[in-house]
Amino acid sequence: MGLETEKADVQLFMDDDSYSHHSGVDYGDPEKFVDSGQDRDPHRLNSQLKVGFEDVIAEPVTTHSFDKVWICSHALFEISKYVLYKFLTVFLAIPLAFVAGILFATLSCLHIWIIMPFVKTCLMVLPSVQTIWKSVTDVIIAPLCTSVGRSFSSISLRLSQD
C-alpha cells in the first residue's frame, strides 16, 4: 500500500499438463502468437473499444490497493476477459455471422435487382414525364388556377356589427 515507484509485471504460469493446446494456436511460440500476419480490423471499426485493464480499471495516485490485490485483479481481469470472449464467440459468432450474411446478401440483391433498375427506369422516363407534365400544367392547371383566382379576387367581405 502506498506510492509504488516501479510497475508490477503480471505473469500467469500454467503447467503443460493442465493446459489444453486444442485451440489451434501454439502459445508456446510467442512469435506466432504476436504476429499472426492477419489484421482482423484493417479499417479500425473498433478502435474506440478499450478492453485493456488500464483502460477499464484505474486507481488514482492518492488511493492504491495492496500490490497483491492489484496483481491478482489484473490477472483475473485478463483471464476472465479471454475465457469469456472465447466462450461467447464460440456460441454467438457463427450464428450472428450467418444472420449478418443473410441480411447483407438480401439487401445487396434488393439493391442490385430491384432498387437500382427502378431508379434508372425513373430517371430514363423523367424527361418525357416532365414534358407531359409541363403541357398538362400549361393547358389545364394554369388556366384553371387563373380563373379561380380571378373569381375569388372579386369577392369582398364586409363585417358589420349589429
Curated annotation (Swiss-Prot):
Superkingdom classification of source: Eukaryota
Modified residues (Phosphoserine): S20, S23, S36
Modified residues (Phosphotyrosine): Y19, Y27
Pfam families: Caveolin
Gene Ontology BP annotations: caveola assembly; endoplasmic reticulum organization; insulin receptor signaling pathway; mitochondrion organization; negative regulation of endothelial cell proliferation; positive regulation of dopamine receptor signaling pathway; regulation of cytosolic calcium ion concentration; skeletal muscle fiber development
GO cellular component: caveola; cytoplasmic vesicle; focal adhesion; Golgi membrane; nucleus; perinuclear region of cytoplasm; plasma membrane raft; sarcolemma
Keyword Nucleus (UniProt): yes
GO function term, MF aspect, one: protein kinase binding
Stretches in topological domain Cytoplasmic: 1-86, 108-162
UniProt entry keywords in alphabetical sequence: Cell membrane, Cytoplasm, Golgi apparatus, Membrane, Nucleus, Phosphoprotein
Family recorded in the similarity comment: Belongs to the caveolin family.
Subunit structure and binding partners: Monomer or homodimer. Interacts with CAV1; the interaction forms a stable heterooligomeric complex that is required for targeting to lipid rafts and for caveolae formation. Tyrosine phosphorylated forms do not form heterooligomers with the Tyr-19-phosphorylated form existing as a monomer or dimer, and the Tyr-27-form as a monomer only. Interacts (tyrosine phosphorylated form) with the SH2 domain-containing proteins, RASA1, NCK1 and SRC. Interacts (tyrosine phosphorylated form) with INSR, the interaction (Tyr-27-phosphorylated form) is increased on insulin stimulation.
Protein name per its UniProtKB record: Caveolin-2
Organism placement in taxonomy: Eukaryota, Metazoa, Chordata, Craniata, Vertebrata
